Structure formats: structure tokens, C-alpha cells
Amino acid sequence: MRSLLLAVCLVLALHCGEAAVSCNTVIADLYPCLSYVTQGGPVPTLCCNGLTTLKSQAQTSVDRQGVCRCIKSAIGGLTLSPRTIQNALELPSKCGVDLPYKFSPSTDCDSIQ
């Protein structure tokens, strides 16, 4: 599953670069979170560092919407279990990072300010 997710992310990185924060950056920042999202357990420190970095880089509405679209595109083609979605939704709070969007396939990226 990791190989598939990585392949999807790399392909999407080529198509999501309109905001100042590129999909390559989003993928690099969130990649350390993959083990927690797919398997649970403790959240890796590098994952929380990536979320913090991502939040600090996405300063404008356009940036935040772009980050949201990259995340949605990366997870959109995957079959996600309810537990995987729950783990993704819990990430920001477990890391103490307040994000203006949720890691969910149902997030409306256009509504993010």
C-alpha cells in the first residue's frame, strides 16, 4: 500500500503546483505520518514536525486550498478504512497543530480561508 500511495503522490505532485506550497512539499512534509495513518500507534515526531512546517508555509488562502487539494488528490484514489480516516483526522490534535482543514476525502477545499 505504501508503494501505491507514494506512486500516486509522486504523479499528483506534477499536477498540484499552482500554490506557493507545492505538492512535492506537502508529500515530503506528510510522508512521515504514513505509518501512523495506516497502522496507528504513536505519532512519529517527524510527522508532527512536518505538520508544523506545512502550517507555517501555507500562509494564504490559496496556499491552504492548494495543500488541501494535494491531500485530497493523494487519498482520493485509495480505499480507506474508517480507522485510517480517523487516524488522519486525529493527526493535527495529536501533534498540537491547529490546521484550517481536515485530512478527509469529504473536505471542501474551496471553503478554506
From Swiss-Prot:
Disulfide bonds join C23-C70, C33-C47, C48-C95, C68-C109. Keywords: Disulfide bond, Lipid-binding, Signal, Transport. GO terms for biological process: lipid transport. It comes from the Eukaryota. PROSITE patterns: PLANT_LTP. Belongs to the plant LTP family. Residues 1-19 form the signal peptide. This is Non-specific lipid-transfer protein 6. It comes from Arabidopsis thaliana (Mouse-ear cress). GO terms for molecular function: lipid binding. InterPro entries: Bifun_inhib/LTP/seed_sf, Bifunc_inhib/LTP/seed_store, Plant_nsLTP. Plant non-specific lipid-transfer proteins transfer phospholipids as well as galactolipids across membranes. May play a role in wax or cutin deposition in the cell walls of expanding epidermal cells and certain secretory tissues. Pfam families: Tryp_alpha_amyl.
